[in-house]
Amino acid sequence: MKLEVNFKKTVGKIKPMNAVNNGPVYTDNGDQNLTNLPDFREANIPFARTHDSSICYDYGGEHTVDIHNIFTDFDADPYSPESYDFTLTDIYLGTIMRAGAKVFYRLGSKIEHWPKHYGIMPPKDYQKWAVVCEHIIMHMNEGWANGFHMGIEYWEIWNEPDFNDKCWTGTPEEFYDFFATAAKYLKARFPSLKIGGPAVCGYNEQWLDAFFEKMREENVPMDFYSWHCYGSKVSDFTSDARRHRAMLDRHGYTDTESILNEWNYVCGWGGDGWKCSLETEASLKGAAFIAAVMSACQREKTDMLMYYDARVNSSMNGLFKRGTLDRLKGYYSVKAWGELLSLQDECALSCDVPDIYSAAAADGETQMLLVAYYTDDAAPLPRTFKVETGEDRLYTIYTLDEEHDMEPLETIASDNGGFTLTMRPNTVVVIK
């Protein structure tokens, strides 16, 4: 068994697999001013999606991002700046950009688990809703209403409309009509921007076939298609990546980007399973899982991954400790991918070692290999295998385990173009 990498052979570009949902927190107040903005910047996080931002007080809570939070009275004049409240959204998006990330803007509402709903009902007037979105985009990108020129490229229509009544209270057919109306209007108004969605919560073939049939009938443009997946096996994500790509291609959307923009470790959604999920997400095993999924999806026909969630008050945040914002183990996997992303060129590799997931990049000066040993087995054992690079040189091993946070632990001299590596279960190493 071996892992073979050829740093001299480029096979493509490293994709933005370390994007996240939500951004850092920052305030210039004199007290209660903890921030993880420098951590974001250091990790080279490329995009931050603004879904569920309004759940978080630190981002502006119920006065930020969501359409009904910005345009609070749907009967108001959508062409009047006085009808909009941009204040806290402007600050939040500015913080994301200050951290070096680009904004991926979700148009719609946060999820609503409550018995009473406020922002997930079908709009009274689909065309007017699209006009409201138009003016939000104008404010962010064209300076309208004392706005900005942020250059936000991705604009996503809605979130999880296929997820019972927590995100959309209308019928599927109502959503198809709504999406078609909004997408066609916004793409005609902003042809250079990427308009897409709808951030489906899973692979429901019946729902998706009907959705795409409607889109084709209406000639609805779709620059990107977004979908979600949660699971405990890497194959959960790679198999869904293939199914969603096949769905797009089957319906003629062959040039549409496929973006997995919610994902995380979940072994159960209730009771002990949910508790295990949350504990794992914040653990070293969760960090190995992050590195494994990013590495595996790099080789799938998926254009971007967006981890859920970097929201600072989220129980599913495996990157930053709630309250203190200390780095958790998962942060170092995201940061390691940020280094690969900065090198740009993906290098050829192959691996037949079970439960070993890897990705490699180089830029002419630096060579980097990311290796994750991820397993969901109850009693896994260490794995020893050969790493073949075809070069005789010194390599530094950086280790992420319970005792170390991606620190350089040893230097290995390759012999006859390779060396032997032993990894403990659910650890990650970077080799440079």
Question: PLM ranges: what are they?
Answer:
Residues 1-43, 51:
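Mature N-terminal, pre-catalytic/accessory segment of carbohydrate-active enzymes
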Residues 20, 145-155, 182-206, 249-269, ...:
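Aromatic-lined carbohydrate-recognition surfaces of secreted/lumenal glycan-active proteins
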Residues 27-40, 205-216, 286-294:
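Short, acidic/polar
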Residues 43-232:
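Substrate-binding cleft and catalytic face of glycoside hydrolase catalytic domains
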Residues 223, 227-274, 303:
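Glycoside hydrolase catalytic-domain groove-lining segments
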Residues 264-358, 363-364:
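Aromatic/acidic polysaccharide-binding cleft in carbohydrate-active enzymes
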Residues 352-391, 400, 425-430:
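Carbohydrate-binding surface patches
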Residues 410-432:
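C-terminal beta-strand-rich structural cap/linker in extracellular carbohydrate-active enzymes
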